[in-house]
């Protein structure tokens, strides 16, 4: 009986109930939207690191690891085949690729920029990284690849370099002597990792031999762990770190790092930045809570005489309190369901259409938007966010209704009946 009365009372004041429900629904919609968006950002960042930057696991010598920011070419890997064989013994490994990174300067007609160069073996690199599929203009390395280079698209735009033109790369060799060599720009790369687009250059081992005197030196081995579509980041991270620990036990003379070991602090910072958005969402829900309090209080004041009649008919204070609490819960359920529906609509849009940052910020570099992402950002489904939003909506309504309901239950019958 009380439930029927509560539902009837909620729909008696349609306009006020509608405004309260809409406020709550919009707040919950923003929560669902931002949750989907930030899970998508997390995935884009991690996928960018895995697909373009360092892959799932990186193996370097301990001497290299201790001075890795200087990219020391002398601290190379001595047991490449052994490490490759051990890595490929795991069922989830899709490929192992050698890389050698160096610091250099790209010079083009009087303009120059410091870059991080990466030396790759094209045929093996394709099994681990997606550099080839990220080509925006031009093509991949030819069979020899000796005098060819790939550079980031934003780097090319900054210096005015076109595909087919010649650039000069200046760098220190393995023996710490200065050298410079000309390369033809074979293609321009556009990835979801801003640092690659803005300051990276790729050479083949054959081409880098003349520039760096590598003599076949490989400073890092990058291992790709299979990542099935739909697997969450925490689940993937757990599998990768399990393999990393196992490899580290078998290779005590080397340092085995997962992508979380390398970028853990950066990813943690991204998590902390989410707090700002969630605070905004909380404020919206707080406004909704104030609206619910207002709705219930107005309902109490408008129905004081009715409350007196109910008490005269034998309703106890706790039943009056329960009636108004039920009204608040009904509003919360309606608002929660409306929020889930609106959240579903925006989720479908952001998951299947995405937000194209490249078009939105055309003419700008990826780093100019202040986020470590580029290209099209897609959201991710998170059923937990829908359930939490609904539960939070009902909880906020219940808490917001408590004090008005308590006030109504404490009214005296004589006071209520005299109220006009």
Residue ranges and their predicted role:
Residues 375-420:
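C-terminal membrane-exit region of the final transmembrane helix in multipass inner-membrane proteins
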Residues 31-36, 274-313, 320-325, 397, ...:
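A hydrophobic alpha-helix feature that marks transmembrane segments and, especially
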Residues 51, 173-277:
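Mechanotransmission and gating elements of multispan inner-membrane complexes involved in transport
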Residues 1-32, 51, 317-318, 322, ...:
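N-terminal Sec/SRP start-transfer signal
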Residues 99-102, 111-120, 135-207:
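Hydrophobic secondary-structure segments that place a key small or acidic residue at a functional site
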Residues 35-116, 139-145:
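Hydrophobic, regular-secondary-structure patches
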Residues 297, 305-351, 388:
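Transmembrane alpha-helical interface segments in multi-pass membrane proteins
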Residues 338-388:
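Short helix-loop junctions at transmembrane helix boundaries
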